[in-house]
Amino acid sequence: MAAKDVKFGNDARVKMLRGVNVLADAVKVTLGPKGRNVVLDKSFGAPTITKDGVSVAREIELEDKFENMGAQMVKEVASKANDAAGDGTTTATVLAQAIITEGLKAVAAGMNPMDLKRGIDKAVASAVEELKALSVPCSDSKAIAQVGTISANSDETVGKLIAEAMDKVGKEGVITVEDGTGLEDELDVVEGMQFDRGYLSPYFINKPETGAVELESPFILLADKKISNIREMLPVLEAVAKAGKPLVIIAEDVEGEALATLVVNTMRGIVKVAAVKAPGFGDRRKAMLQDIATLTGGTVISEEIGMELEKATLEDLGQAKRVVINKDTTTIIDGVGEEAAIQGRVGQIRKQIEEATSDYDREKLQERVAKLAGGVAVIKVGAATEVEMKEKKARVDDALHATRAAVEEGVVAGGGVALVRVAAKLAGLTAQNEDQNVGIKVALRAMEAPLRQIVSNAGEEPSVVANNVKAGEGNYGYNAATEEYGNMIDFGILDPTKVTRSALQYAASVAGLMITTECMVTDMPKGDAPDLXAAGMGG
């Protein structure tokens, strides 16, 4: 086992604070409308340019093991804030740095670290309640656009695109961000249900100019099995041909003679058919087939429930106004399923979302709700170079998370003002003893840090602006972009309550642990390996 290097007390804390400051100073230059970019070197490809706090934090590793421990703990703050609300990572880092710096000063002055932590925790718990009281619901698209704009670093087009996307697909809808092809940002809304499976044979294409299969008011056969024997399908095919409508087959797979016969029938014009694989795998495939059945008013033909394909009738088939299938996707537009059944299915999936334990499962379930309830919007990010594209995509992603958080828990005045107001309200808060009271003061003083940093990045004097803002009340604050004082809500500078709350909670959690650290243990740096030749051989 490698030898360990151990540091105690003030020695350990000084080293740790140095690491915290290196990381926090690198991250906090990005805060606010006049925050700067950080360039990150990559081992291959062009460097990445970013204004996203968590991306900067993730890149930082320090050579000194003790300093690195401090940096890694603050990195955890940024990551946690990012996971919880998708934004506010820089604010969380600035708050953590402020609480740690003030807290360690108090420890050096002889305060009890455990009592300090209790005081900080008490102040933060009260601050979270105050934030909730200040919070205003965010429902109209103007407010949504403003939140998106602020989070995308004052990029108005991004804010408007997100608001428009939410308008079109609803609050439940799925909005994804992709690379665009041009220089402009675009919004693409997919009505109906789309899944990522294309046609099984290019011979089904009936619109050669677009390379797609378009079928008007088709029947939809849903089978949870592989179809390779055409005999199983003959009764259904004959019934569909009699009805004079096209048929879409969605099955685990269609292969061999079954696929060949369908292609021949289509080419001869006997019956228009198109076959696609069912989306997903395993249990998720079964669930998605059931979703499609609910949407189109059909039944999934599955041997698990004793149904056979040969005995299927037209009543078992779903219907839709239109189905469009291209190489990679299938879109079902206006299924004829009953609204009550669709809402029931959505309710069922929402229940599963509440019980889901992994983020991946939750995301997939939310996608299913969106496909049933609203639709899917894709924001295509345009840029001149790939480096700019990456940077912009990260900002749009942040803005999207921020607007979702705003819709969820409401908004408060932005620009660091909400935390300043909360701190002023809690000025009279006291705890069981003097050391805990100092802890409360440490947390309340730290709540000014985001405002001061925004002002400092804008090249103004933080103390002057902070005093002016504190002298005002309500939503009165400082707009760093235009260098004006006024009502932050009127300026359109809003922060999602969830983002501000998460930033404060995670910052205080990690800072409290670091203040109470008394000893640090790390591996000794390995010396150079001894030179084997020097041992000498008996001659």
Swiss-Prot record:
Changing residue 362 to K: In strain: JCM 7000. GO terms for cellular component: cytoplasm. Changing residue 473 to D: In strain: JCM 7000. Changing residue 179 to E: In strain: JCM 7000. One of its GO terms (biological process) is protein refolding. Changing residue 341 to T: In strain: JCM 7000. Changing residue 347 to T: In strain: JCM 7000. Pfam families: Cpn60_TCP1 (PF00118). Disulfide bonds: none annotated. Changing residue 130 to K: In strain: JCM 7000. One of its GO terms (molecular function) is ATP-dependent protein folding chaperone. InterPro entries: Chaperonin_Cpn60_CS, Cpn60/GroEL, Cpn60/GroEL/TCP-1, GroEL-like_apical_dom_sf, GROEL-like_equatorial_sf, TCP-1-like_intermed_sf. Changing residue 524 to L: In strain: JCM 7000. Its EC number is 5.6.1.7. It is found in: Cytoplasm. Together with its co-chaperonin GroES, plays an essential role in assisting protein folding. The GroEL-GroES system forms a nano-cage that allows encapsulation of the non-native substrate proteins and provides a physical environment optimized to promote and accelerate protein folding. Forms a cylinder of 14 subunits composed of two heptameric rings stacked back-to-back. Interacts with the co-chaperonin GroES. This is Chaperonin GroEL. It comes from Enterobacter agglomerans (Erwinia herbicola).
